[in-house]
Amino acid sequence: MSSIRRRHAAASLDTPAVGGRHELGQNFLVDRGVCTRIAEVVSSTTAHPVLELGAGDGAITRALVAANLPVTALELDPRRVRRLQRTFADGVTVVHGDMLRYDFGPYPHHVVSTVPFSITTPLLRRLIGQRFWHTAVLLVQWEVARKRAGVGGTTMLTAASWPWYEFTLVERVPKTSFDPVPSVDGGILVIERRSAPLLDDRCVGDYQNLVREVYTGPGRGLAAILRTRLPGREVDAWLRRERVDPAALPRDLKAGHWASLYRLYREVGTRPAPAGRSVRARPGSVGPDRSLPPRGLRSGPPRARRRGGGA
């Protein structure tokens, strides 16, 4: 049994039974083909145990087991925890817990989850704040999957972690693949920790301040936005060098652009300002931003209110 599974094998089930699917915000994946596809994506990565967040009735769990993957299945509903324990007597460690509070543990692993649509953003923030997972395969709302993968424009949350993570959109999942049927389709999103980060971990705080400044700064287009913080000649030279349209928006930048822009800020001696303040750079003075999620790669996320699992 793997370390991550041994660590949580004895979970308490004394918590009273909570409500049904609606109360937990659950839409269970019932399409076996999609479950198999998720297991295939995980199997194609490095060999690590799998932590499944919100195992529900075990549809994805079953596909992971069929792919010979060691699984720790986390579920909030005690009734479903007991059902999972009966169904998977061997090969799966079933844990009762909340995915927004669960300690992932200091062991290399992959993460799989059909994320309850109502807690997608909190879960992504928490996930980015955990250090030891390698690949996360998540089933989220279709539009969220597209935005996080930078299709049609990148969100601030993705840009804030892009130098350290890669985001890939795998495929669209019809809403009829869920029970009960939600109002929107889902999408399989893969997040992988970069083996060679574009920036050092020590840059996290200042880099995230930069991302916030650029996304929320005044001006129309990147040229105008960046000139509020950098000399015009430096801005023009950077735009030409990176082949970025001066009228482009922050959402149009790619991971390499963001890393290059951060280096430019450091080179010209301008430190991105924490929330609402403008300060000059001091050698070695970097720290995690307290206002922009994720909160950094070196520390965990803030405590979250208790919400349901899903599968």
UniProtKB/Swiss-Prot annotation:
The keyword Methyltransferase applies. Residues 272-311 are annotated as: Disordered. Its EC number is 2.1.1.-. Residues 293-302 have a biased composition (Low complexity). One of its GO terms (cellular component) is cytosol. It is an enzyme of class 2 (transferase). One of its GO terms (biological process) is response to antibiotic. The keyword Transferase applies. This is Mycinamicin-resistance protein MyrB. It comes from Micromonospora griseorubida. The gene is myrB.
